[in-house]
Amino acid sequence: MKQHTFKTPVATAVKKGLALTLFPVALMLTGCSQSQAPANQAEQSVQQQQADYLNTALPLEDRVKALVDSMTLEEKIAQMYNDAPAIERLGVPAYDYWNEALHGVARAGEATVFPQAIGMAAMWDREFLNDIATVISDEGRAKHHAFKAQGISYRYAGLTYWSPNINIFRDPRWGRGQETYGEDPYLTGELGVAFINGLQGDDDTYLKTAATAKHFAVHNGPEITRHSDNYVVSDKDLYETYLPAFEKAVVDADVEAVMCAYNRVNGMPACGSDMLLKDILRAEYGFDGHVMSDCGAIADFYDRKAHASTRSPAAAAAWAVNSGTDLNCGVGTLSSFANLSFAVQKGFIDESLIDQAVTRLFMTRFKLGMFDPDSSVPYASIPLDSVGSQEHLSMTQQASEKSLVLLKNNGVLPLKPGIKVAVIGPNGDNQ
């Protein structure tokens, strides 16, 4: 509103007193009308944006855009962590992306446990692995909605699974090699597709859960040096050995998320590699989901004991987002994205790239049906009693039997009649 300056001649002290009395009242009344209008407009704007992003009749892209456009820079940056906080004024609930499902729903109470990934790879059975992943996603959905009904929202209760691990197991010193499907690129690619399809479901509208292909790329231990390793790889080895499984995950399974690795590839941190994240993942493969860092990987950019590729957390955060990393897994000193606001102010990064990252993240949550009525989401009705059901337990026994491989028969088979087997240890009677 345009401000006016009043110039009224005052003849007497009485008039002066009257003018002094009335003028503050006029200012006060004007001030009321000025402050109320913007407040009402802002409230109406927020209500309209809420109506838009919750309107299931609108295209998904329009709903997400309405939500992101209504957020402040600080709110958007806060959503770029695995433990994204609630935005109460917009009705956005808190969400933690951290969950695992390599061979069963992890860390969320009891669940059916299948053999570790390296064992399931030994089955050489795409269809059965897909069935196993379907069981895992059934149980994950059932658990998620049970938590939701109780008002519980915490780490490991979500629907974004940081699985499968489709790295190539080349180095026997890698203590987590059992999480992979082994050292064969073809087998790993085929099984990765089967597992991802089982996790994500086959509905045309909604994701059952969101799978994450990890760790992109050339990551295979040993663990002790994973934060500082620099793997120098030829194009031939990169494209024939380390990348095929990721290409299949994107092209054949439409995987929703990719986790970038701790290590450097040809001198560049994987989570800051334009070659990996822009040129290969998005341009060559056509990936349109979100990219998240392994936990603490962005801090490795400037950590003297790690890559020390840059000196400041702000530069590291801007570098990662500029290269295409959308989500930072990290807390405390590892939470480098806390410096993104400073990076925007200093011109290290444009806010439009923050918008792009947050849009990708919310697209995943919307695809999972998190902002729609449960009645619209087909997977929301999976009963909790499916968790650990007899059918699922029978499948895990079958998987265990199929995973056993005898490399050399030194008189072991056939088993002699009457032989006794001792089962020793605290889990001997654990179903």
Predicted regions and their residues:
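N-terminal secretory signal peptides that target proteins for export/translocation
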Residues: 1-13
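Intrinsically disordered, low-complexity serine/threonine-rich segments
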Residues: 9, 26, 36-38
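Intrinsically disordered, low-complexity Ser/Thr/Pro-rich tracts
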Residues: 14, 18, 107-109
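Bacterial N-terminal signal peptides
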Residues: 17-30
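Glycoside hydrolase catalytic-domain context in secreted enzymes
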Residues: 32-431
